[in-house]
């Protein structure tokens, strides 16, 4: 018989120790990876619920298993909230991840070998937008578009590539682009050749939900997102659409189940429902506004300290530092900042001379530190500390001094109070 007082600590000390160490790491390190965030205890409560026990293949009202009357309510809540939050009339909340959601879109709209126009990974795109090491690059004919000399998306080149190659689908969205995307312009380009416009808004979904960044749903045929990152929910995916094309919606549903997945993760879907409700609260909008303010404040410090920021600024939650002229690699910068308890990720920059395993840049994002309560004053101080480390990358005394400051500010701004 299962007893509710059963716990990991008493049963599996080795695993529990690693879990506890990760908890300490999150509290004592400043998280600046743009794709990471802290989810609420309510979301974690849903993920740790008995819903994990329930198999529910199919969709609400159309299940293959019995006993789904309550998980139907859970999933319908998540669907309805997703549609309301993003102004969609279709939502699928079952994808296990953003990549799974993207895979479903490819499956629904394309045939293997079809031509797709996607953002170059080296210039800000994502693996699932056509990287040769990903299913998207292996199964489809990918034509990359990129950025111009100013670091902005080159829409003229995109239009030219579209006319020349006649892709069946154009992908909007990014994993390392700090500007505002002109979704309407992308739709114009797609319409000019009769292509689908598919937008992956994973990185900016929270900003979009709060009205801080333009919403692609009115412009795209299909939109996907993760439910973590700026949306601050559980790790998972979501598909949205608007326009009333019921045939498209059926294709998308079939592409998720039974094509790509079996039973949905009902405990995660419940957590998505919680996070979507949280994203409708007034304080969520205040949070997202602060995310954008904090990113801008950090950029200002880096520029004043002589660091190159790709595109010269940011209009969302992230930015890239180009370290080529500092004779530093992203790998070196990542490691040095890590020793000071500041977590970033190495990232390729435009025309990067280094390999993706080394890189010449780092990506910095503000969602997690803002979630802790940091405002402009704190992130400016933080950016200054980062410059101190990068200016003295081999000076362990500087790194230790910064680490002490990091530990102090983390204690004053805990993740979970």
Curated annotation (Swiss-Prot):
Pathway: One-carbon metabolism; tetrahydrofolate interconversion; Amino-acid biosynthesis; glycine biosynthesis; glycine from L-serine: step 1/1. It comes from the Bacteria. The record marks 228 as: Plays an important role in substrate specificity. One of its GO terms (cellular component) is cytosol. Its EC number is 2.1.2.1. It is found in: Cytoplasm. It catalyses: (6R)-5,10-methylene-5,6,7,8-tetrahydrofolate + glycine + H2O = (6S)-5,6,7,8-tetrahydrofolate + L-serine. This is Serine hydroxymethyltransferase. It comes from Salmonella arizonae (strain ATCC BAA-731 / CDC346-86 / RSK2980). The gene is glyA.
């Amino acid at each position: 018989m299962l007893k509710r007082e059963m716990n990991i600590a008493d049963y599996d000390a080795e695993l529990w120790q690693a879990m506890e160490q990760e908890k300490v790491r999150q509290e004592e390190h400043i998280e600046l990876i743009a794709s990471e965030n802290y989810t609420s205890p309510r979301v974690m409560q849903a993920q740790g619920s008995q819903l994990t026990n329930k198999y529910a293949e199919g969709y609400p009202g159309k299940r293959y298993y019995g006993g789904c009357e309550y998980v139907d309510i859970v999933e319908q809540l998540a669907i309805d909230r997703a549609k309301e939050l993003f102004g969609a009339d279709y939502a699928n909340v079952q994808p296990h991840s953003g990549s799974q959601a993207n895979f479903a879109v490819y499956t629904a709209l394309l045939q293997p070998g079809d031509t797709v126009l996607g953002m170059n990974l080296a210039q800000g795109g994502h693996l699932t937008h056509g990287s040769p090491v990903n299913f998207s690059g292996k199964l489809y004919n990918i034509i990359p578009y990129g950025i111009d000399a100013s670091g902005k998306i080159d829409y003229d080149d995109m239009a030219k590539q579209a006319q020349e190659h006649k892709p069946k689908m154009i992908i909007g969205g990014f994993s390392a682009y700090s500007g505002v995307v002109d979704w309407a312009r992308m739709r114009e380009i797609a319409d000019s050749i009769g292509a689908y416009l598919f937008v992956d808004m994973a990185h900016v979904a929270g900003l979009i939900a709060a009205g801080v960044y333009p919403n692609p749903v009115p412009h795209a045929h299909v939109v996907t997102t993760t439910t973590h990152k700026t949306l601050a929910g559980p790790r998972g995916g979501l598909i949205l659409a608007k326009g009333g094309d019921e045939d498209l919606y059926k294709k998308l549903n079939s592409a998720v189940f039974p094509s790509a997945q079996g039973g949905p993760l009902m405990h995660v879907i419940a957590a998505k429902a919680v996070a979507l409700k949280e994203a409708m609260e007034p304080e969520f909008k205040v949070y997202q506004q602060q995310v954008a303010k904090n990113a801008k404040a950090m950029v200002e410090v880096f520029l004043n300290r002589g660091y190159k920021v790709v595109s010269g600024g940011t209009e969302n939650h992230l930015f890239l530092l180009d370290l080529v002229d500092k004779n530093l690699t992203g790998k070196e910068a990542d490691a040095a900042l890590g020793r000071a308890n500041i977590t970033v990720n190495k990232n390729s920059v435009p025309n990067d001379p280094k390999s993706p395993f080394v890189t010449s840049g780092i990506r910095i994002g503000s969602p997690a530190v803002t979630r802790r309560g940091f405002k402009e004053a704190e992130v400016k101080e933080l950016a200054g500390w980062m410059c101190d480390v990068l200016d003295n990358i081999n000076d362990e005394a500087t790194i230790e001094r910064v680490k002490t400051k990091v530990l102090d500010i983390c204690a004053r701004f805990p993740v979970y109070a």
